Amino acid sequence: MSDLKAAALRALKLMDLTTLNDDDTDAKVISLCHDAKTAVGNTAAICIYPRFIPIAKKTLREQGTPEVRIATVTNFPHGNDDIDIAVAETKAAVAYGADEVDVVFPYRALMAGDEKVGFELVKQCKEACGDILLKVIIETGELKEEALIKKASQICIEAGADFIKTSTGKVPVNATPEYARMMLEVIRDMGVAETVGFKPAGGVRTAEDAAAYLAMADEILGDNWVDARHYRFGASSLLTNLLNTLEVSDDVADPTAY
């Protein structure tokens, strides 16, 4: 197997296959669940709006892939600084049956100099999650500056985040290798690689993209760090490219170019 094919297979099994569109329907989510099951293995998870969790759970069970995890989003996509709303949404997501919650960090508050609200929001959302994985989206493409990206990452980790995630996919600039490196370096420098994972999201569209991100993680955190507990790709259109690279002809619906 070529290096690119090996990376493609690795990336496929780390995907949070995503549809987060205003026009999502039960039918689109059912199709997404079908896409998560491929001839070369399953994606790690699907990522959907909370209201679709019951239909997704049913579909995944019926198609024989109950191990595909269901991630959902809260405080999404704007990252407002109302802690009570973020916590209420997170509790509701857990009640719906989410396996993982991707919450948006109040990044604008941090840009305005408020570090406390982000810490408290993440801390309380993690308490609401219990054992359920909490991924925190810091919106790197809006923070832009290395100091802010690293500070947001540190706050999230100190507050109990299980993952730090680049982006919502809803702003002009999403994951970039530059931003990914900053966040991976924080995980390394804080000595939390055993407990904290990383998720680039938005803009990872090809096997070559994914291979470069994985090589960076191997370089910074070691060859044995990347696994589904420590690394995910938030993407939709990536799956078709990975399957093409692997020369597998699955008929994949493309919910967006996320």
UniProtKB/Swiss-Prot annotation:
Enumerate the catalysed reactions: 2-deoxy-D-ribose 5-phosphate = D-glyceraldehyde 3-phosphate + acetaldehyde
> Which pathway is this protein assigned to?
Carbohydrate degradation; 2-deoxy-D-ribose 1-phosphate degradation; D-glyceraldehyde 3-phosphate and acetaldehyde from 2-deoxy-alpha-D-ribose 1-phosphate: step 2/2
Q: Where in the cell is it found?
A: Cytoplasm
Give the enzyme's EC designation. Answer: 4.1.2.4
Q: Which GO terms describe its molecular function?
A: deoxyribose-phosphate aldolase activity
Family, according to the entry, reads as follows: Belongs to the DeoC/FbaB aldolase family. DeoC type 2 subfamily.
Its biological purpose is as follows: Catalyzes a reversible aldol reaction between acetaldehyde and D-glyceraldehyde 3-phosphate to generate 2-deoxy-D-ribose 5-phosphate.
Cite the NCBIfam families for this sequence: deoC
Output this protein's name: Deoxyribose-phosphate aldolase
Record organism: Vibrio parahaemolyticus serotype O3:K6 (strain RIMD 2210633)
